[in-house]
């Protein structure tokens, strides 16, 4: 079984690698304990599926944040205007701010 950066390398722009590593260790350690205490491998069999689900959610969020916060080329007016519109919407939408905050601090396990 792989965990942390050995399982998934995150770009530093998202600053999410440590969150994912803790999540991996949480799920893997619980699965190993269950296996060795109760001879039950169910959670071990699901570990990769659980981990990958969180990885893809986190990569999607990191990509979204990178696109939101990095300035597009000056010639690309459409991208710039879309980015500004999204930033404006985030500044006024409580539900958007909640989603941003939940993903920024890390998904619950």
Residue ranges and their predicted role:
Residues 1-12:
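Short FAD-binding loop at a beta-strand-to-alpha-helix junction that anchors the flavin cofactor
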Residues 12-23:
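A conserved FAD-binding loop/helix module that cradles the flavin
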Residues 13-15, 30-109:
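C-terminal helical "tail/cap" subdomain of flavin- and related membrane-associated enzymes
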Residues 21, 25, 32-35:
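C-terminal, non-catalytic macromolecule-binding modules
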């Amino acid at each position: 079984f792989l965990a942390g950066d050995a399982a998934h390398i995150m770009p530093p722009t998202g600053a999410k690698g440590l969150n994912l590593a803790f999540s991996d260790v949480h799920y893997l350690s619980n699965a190993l304990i269950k296996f060795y205490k109760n001879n039950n491998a169910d959670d071990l069999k699901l570990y990769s599926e659980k981990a990958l689900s969180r990885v893809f959610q986190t990569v999607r969020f990191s990509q979204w944040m990178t696109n939101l916060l990095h300035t597009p080329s000056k010639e690309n007016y459409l991208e710039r205007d879309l980015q500004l519109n999204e930033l404006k919407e985030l500044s006024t939408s409580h539900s958007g701010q909640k989603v941003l905050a939940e993903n920024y601090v890390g998904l619950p396990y």
